[in-house]
């Protein structure tokens, strides 16, 4: 399997030039890796795989459900072309047995090849996390035609804000858990250079975390524009907080309605958001902006990681496919206290998070509600699922306000 530089140098002429131009800064990161990897491999050979197998008896994440001693034994000595190992994939899941709100995946990828080299473990995890999607036999579809969306205007007495986000990874550079400092800085350079070409209502500027004051950072976090500081154990155990805040930042347009995070959990997170309940408008801007970002990236000789089985490749298997999370902040004081609320969400394929995101609790009965699936359905299908599902939640809240009963909807048909 080709390594990052061989893939780069076999690509288009413009990509070869960029790869060669960046070789001086990147070579150290690639060439200095093998020695510690070989040393670790030599130490490992002193012990059988059974002696290295992690204790997962109290774990309930997806990785722990599928990693058997036999699978571990077959995969533990394999590495990707950049030296990423199985133990590095699973460390975050070993260190974090479970989560109070959602069942986490418990593993990450270090590069694009991770999903192939360790497919024996990743494929069943992907199948569990993505509602039965089988990456060995199925193909993912992409659809960024926002004109297909029906309705998409929520009652703003309940929906406070609407947001659509995705992630994209730059092909040929390691993902955040594995990247060197040089690679991370190269991601920032490539992305920021491309974003400088955005025009019209998408035009904006880039802000490096290292150049912000603590107060400026916190204000952006409190306003839900910026990713939080890397305090989540899921991030730190995966190695994604290394060298913080080097080469991290946020780009946003002048209205702060179109944003790109750089080098947090993924190379990029592309976000369209605004206050209120106009999800259709948010998705239209998302599709238009994302297409333009990809065009600008390709114009400079780079491309996003993608394949027809897994869609867009990202760090966490939960974000494969579309990488899309369409969500609202919604106030549900009565429904949230109803014992049927979790089952309603489950049957609608929706996910509940706290007001501030994945590691927070709800305040004032305000929840972050979004699609559970990412892979096997297109962007249009997932946004429509959220629109229909959120409208159902609002209808339930209204019925409870009137003292009427609500019902659990039948499970959505599983169509991949």
Swiss-Prot record:
Main location per the UniProt record: mitochondrion
GO molecular function, one term: ATP binding
Phosphagen kinase N-terminal domain mapped to chain residues: 44-131
EC number of this enzyme: 2.7.3.2
GO BP terms, alphabetized: phosphocreatine biosynthetic process
Keywords: ATP-binding, Kinase, Membrane, Mitochondrion, Mitochondrion inner membrane, Nucleotide-binding, Phosphoprotein, Transferase, Transit peptide
Coiled-coil region(s): none
Region listing for Cardiolipin-binding, in residue ranges: 40-63
Major enzyme class: transferase
Entry-annotated residues carrying Phosphoserine: 151, 196, 232, 365
InterPro entries: ATP-guanido_PTrfase, ATP-guanido_PTrfase_AS, ATP-guanido_PTrfase_cat, ATP-guanido_PTrfase_N, ATP-guanido_PTrfase_N_sf, Gln_synth/guanido_kin_cat_dom
GO cellular component terms attached to this protein's record: mitochondrial inner membrane; mitochondrion
Highest rank taxon of the organism: Eukaryota
Every Phosphagen kinase C-terminal domain range: 158-400
CDD domains, A to Z: creatine_kinase_like
Modified residues (Phosphothreonine): 213, 355
Residues that bind ATP: 161-165, 224, 269, 325, 353-358, 368
Pfam families: ATP-gua_Ptrans, ATP-gua_PtransN
Membrane topology annotation: Peripheral membrane protein
Transit peptide limits: 1-39
Subunit description: Exists as an octamer composed of four MTCK homodimers.
Function: Reversibly catalyzes the transfer of phosphate between ATP and various phosphogens (e.g. creatine phosphate). Creatine kinase isoenzymes play a central role in energy transduction in tissues with large, fluctuating energy demands, such as skeletal muscle, heart, brain and spermatozoa.
Family membership: Belongs to the ATP:guanido phosphotransferase family.
Note: Mitochondrial creatine kinase binds cardiolipin.
PANTHER family: ARGININE OR CREATINE KINASE, CREATINE KINASE U-TYPE, MITOCHONDRIAL
UniProt name for this protein: Creatine kinase U-type, mitochondrial
């Amino acid at each position: 399997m080709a390594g990052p530089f061989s893939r780069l140098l076999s690509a288009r002429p413009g990509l070869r030039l960029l790869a060669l131009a960046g070789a001086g800064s990147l070579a150290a990161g690639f060439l200095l890796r093998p020695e510690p990897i070989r040393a670790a491999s030599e130490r490992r050979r002193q012990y059988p795989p059974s002696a290295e197998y992690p204790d997962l008896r109290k774990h309930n994440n997806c990785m722990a459900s599928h990693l058997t001693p036999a699978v571990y034994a077959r995969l533990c000595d394999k590495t990707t072309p950049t030296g990423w190992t199985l133990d590095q994939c699973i460390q975050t899941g070993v260190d974090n047995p479970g989560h109070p709100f959602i069942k986490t995946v418990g593993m990450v990828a270090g590069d694009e090849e991770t999903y192939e080299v360790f497919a024996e473990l990743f494929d069943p995890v992907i199948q569990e996390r993505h509602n039965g999607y089988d990456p060995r036999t199925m193909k993912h579809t992409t659809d960024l035609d926002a004109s297909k969306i029906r309705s998409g205007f929520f009652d703003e007495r309940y929906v406070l804000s609407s947001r659509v986000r995705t992630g994209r990874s730059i092909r040929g550079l390691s993902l955040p858990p594995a990247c060197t400092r040089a690679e991370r800085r190269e991601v920032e350079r490539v992305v920021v250079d491309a974003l400088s070409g955005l025009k019209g209502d998408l035009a904006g500027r880039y802000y490096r975390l290292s150049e912000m004051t603590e107060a400026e950072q916190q204000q952006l976090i409190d306003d839900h524009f910026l990713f939080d500081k890397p305090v989540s154990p899921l991030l730190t155990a995966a190695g994604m907080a290394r060298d913080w805040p080097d080469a991290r930042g946020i780009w946003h347009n002048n209205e702060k309605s179109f944003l790109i995070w750089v080098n947090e959990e993924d190379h990029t997170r592309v976000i369209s958001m605004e206050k209120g309940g106009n999800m259709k408008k948010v998705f239209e801007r998302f599709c238009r902006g994302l297409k333009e970002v990809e065009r600008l990236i390709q114009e400079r000789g780079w491309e996003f990681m993608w394949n027809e089985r897994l869609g867009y490749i990202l760090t966490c298997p939960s974000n494969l496919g579309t990488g899309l999370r369409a969500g609202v902040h919604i106030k549900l004081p009565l429904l949230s206290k109803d014992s049927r609320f979790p089952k309603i969400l489950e049957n609608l394929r929706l996910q509940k998070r706290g007001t501030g995101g994945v590691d927070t609790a709800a305040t004032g009965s305000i929840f972050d509600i979004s699609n559970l699936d990412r892979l096997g359905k297109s962007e249009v299908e997932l946004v429509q699922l959220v629109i229909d599902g959120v409208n159902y939640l609002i209808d339930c809240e209204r019925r409870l306000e009137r003292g009427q009963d609500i019902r659990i909807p039948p499970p959505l048909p599983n169509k991949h």
